[in-house]
Amino acid sequence: LTLTNFGNQDKVTVLSKIITTITVAIALTLFSASCNTIILTLQPFEPIYGIPIQVFALPMILGYLGIITAEVKKENIIPLLAGLIIGLFLSLPAFNELAIFRFNSDIPVLMKAANFVHAAMDFLRIFLILGLIGMALLGLPLFMTIAGIALVLYVGGGQTPTFITYTGYNLLRDSSLPAIPLFTVAGFILSKSGATKRLVKLFREAFGWFPGGEAFAAVLVCVFFTTFTGANGVTILAMGSLLAGILLDTGAYQEKTVHGLLTASSSIGLLFPPSIAVIVYFIAGTFIYQNNPDFVGSESFTVTNIFLGTIVPGIIFSLAMGGSAVWISIKNKAPRHQFNIKEAGSALLNTLPELLIPLIIVLFTFTGLASLTETASLLILYLLIVEGLFTYKDKKQEQISNAIGDDFKFMVSTVSDAVSIAGGTLIIIAMARALSNYLIDFGLAEYFVTWTQNIVHSKVLFLLLLNILLLITGCLMDIFSATLVIVPLIIPLGNYFGIHPVHLAAIFITNLTIGFLTPPIGMNLFLASYAFNKPVLTIYKSVVPFFLLQLVVLVLVTWIPALSLVFVR
């Protein structure tokens, strides 16, 4: 990549071809392993509603096959072939496993080849892992990086790649996991409907009359939409320009202040139910607490309690961001939006269906009337009815033809966008769980815990180091993979230092929420740069004051457990 006769375009081309080769190699290996998972581990005599269980696992195979076929392009022939060859080489242990356990056949040549792959991966383990991490920084998709590291560790440790795909399949059978794509679909229905404009109008009418009210309203809108889409990036990209335009039109704020406020507010919604981050944390921690019932407060480790534990920190974050806007507005002597009770009442009436959403979630989830997955399903049904009626009403008022085909296209587009986000999240979760299981099964997690206990003897020092580690982790990794990899390591340490499970969860999720803003590579910084069409360094500078304010809130959440435990049952 550094040859002097290469221009910048050539460097990008070579890099993309290397990424293609790695992607195809890993995807083909996981495709082979997925076939083994279906053939060797799933019993055909366990049908679901009369349908063979293997049918439900087919998307796993088709997904990896789709990744490979997506790279089939004329300009990719050489890297594609290279990836296929490497993938076949890495699949040899899986082929050998299939021959032995399915066909009861020991093929000496295949067995020797599989053993050679194990030995080669073991010898090159460190170099391959460092190489994958380096390629991740240069553009290799995160789930491929995690899958590649898991592949190197498992195969280098004498196991077959089937362990990875089987772990992912087992995780996807978790009863809480379907809530993730369902809430994502619900969030996208909400964000793509007219609810956005109605909520913005409501919050402006309700809060715009006091100093900084419109900025405070913008914070609430960001929080609301991040909560229900489950992806803070969607909030920035879909609503950043709209909200920035509204605030800049007031003349009360500098452009950098507006961009910093909206960027900093875009991830706060991850602290409110039905936060997908909380669901993933619960999934990651359940295995640990089930196997260690003697851990401090293990009986309190429920998804409902974690939801309750992050509500107060979320409120404090929202007040901190909104309060800073109020202070800036007072300082600049900004004009206020005149309160009109008629307009406010009309806006309230129009947004009543959306305002009932939190109540629906609380009513069904926290009272036990429905499981999290059932609540998500009911929410989708509710939104389809409500937003469908409002869409029809809006079109009628604007005298727009309400063709059935247009509504169908809207639904297909919404579900397609939601599925791409949810699918990406689920595959990251599956690969991260496989890596996490390796750390546990091979004793690396236990070694890390013991090593930490030997050098950290103070709860104060542990919490300080934990916050630093999690801020860095949140900067480098997405919240889902970070949760599944890191949580099994910190829960035993939290128990050792006497930290309540719900308090630990609140600290963890709060840190990773702030991690999205942490320079130099916090994800939201780059998304904001794109959304606001500003250099990323400009976004850095605009975010710093709000980032520091959020660190103050983090200190409160860390050192005042009551903030997280006040509602815990």
Segments the model singles out, each with a brief description of its role:
Residues 36-40, 44, 77-569:
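Alpha-helical transmembrane segments of multi-pass membrane transport proteins
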Residues 1-101:
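Alpha-helical transmembrane segments and membrane-interface helix-loop junctions
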